[in-house]
Amino acid sequence: MATNNQTTRKEIEAVYNCIAQDFSNTRTKYNIWHSVRKFIEELPSESLVADIGCGNGKNMQLRCDELEYIGMDISDEMVTICQTRGFNVVQGDILQIPFDDEYVDACMSIAVIHHLTTRAERISAIRELIRITKPGGKLIIYVWAFEQPESSKRKFTSHDEMVPFTNKDGTTYYRYYHLYTDGELLGEVMEACPDLTIIESLTEMGNYVIVAETV
């Protein structure tokens, strides 16, 4: 029998399958967040980079001639979009990433773990990201923040919300988001692995960002 948390992840998978094409059309390499771009640009050439929750693969377009990417997404439709574009992407769950221990040189999780409903799940997901990354490897985690800049279209009234996405045909779908408070992501990361070296902990355009080095 599926637990409530498993059901929620299945719901997220189903929603992204429904919105995949229209969602993908709103995500291009030209709207990659600054911290993500900086993270990718600073990686050594020939690094093997995992993008966990890669969506349409927009981040994997950067330095794709110098880096080797492997992506994973929960949505079959997103995986198909990525594969059509020539990216090496598999379907999977962030709580059970289908990669070996210490497999990649760097790992990205961009706007993913805020879809998990409990702190325990989010910490487990962070441990999975660390597990697949080699010692001395780099890790970036990016999540939505509760407090948003005045210029943002995002406005939240609680720390757990169902956020709408409307397809071109007018159908609206809702995705669960946990909206982080200041210091919350850092706390989860340090609970997941107290020995992790934190390189940066910052706020960017209504998001919290952690960049770390694994041990």
What role is predicted for each listed range?
Residues 1-50, 55-96, 120, 138-215:
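Class I (Rossmann-like) S-adenosyl-L-methionine-dependent methyltransferase catalytic domain
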Residues 105, 122:
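Functionally critical, cavity-lining and gating residues within the transmembrane helices
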Residues 108:
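A conserved beta-strand element that flanks and buttresses the S-adenosyl-L-methionine
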Residues 111-115:
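Short catalytic micro-motifs in class I SAM-dependent methyltransferases
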Residues 123-135:
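A short glycine-rich, Lys/Arg-flanked "PGG" loop and its adjoining helix->strand segment in the class I
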